[in-house]
Amino acid sequence: NGMTSDAHSSSGKLLMDAANIPSLIAAPWLNYCDIDDETYQNTRDFALSDDNPYFYVGTYASGIGDPHDSISGLPNPHKEYPVVWPMSIAMQGLTSNDETEIDTCLDYLMDLTGGTYVMHEAVNANDPSEYSRDYFTWPCALFAELYMQRHFYQVT
């Protein structure tokens, strides 16, 4: 069993998590639940899997995208064109106790700047030079928090 955030389909079920915050993956960061909560962990496992239609795997990163992707111009979801949101990757790291996963998220984020060295709203995970918003402070702040947490505070 997992958490739900929205139910708009004709069946009353919409199985997904999107990149924006608040999101299901952000629940512990928002103090909604404990990071070790079983229901949350089931939800997190789903959100970070191919079962989530907005989870994308690319050459430079894997992560959650969003129905409001403004890069591809394709109908969503579009697994063949993996557009991830850096804020969701930062949130994945911020809601992890696994140092390897946190380091992977930091690496992904640094690889997704498209040579600008700042975070963007959405990025093509196969070609980081394709992105929306030249500079987006929200994921920049989340990246800074994740970096500080990993390198200056003990991850518990």
Enumerate the language-model features and the residues they cover.
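Extended ligand-binding clefts on enzyme/binding-domain cores
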Residues: 1-88, 96
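C-terminal capping/lid segments that line or modulate ligand- or cofactor-binding pockets
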Residues: 14-38, 79-156
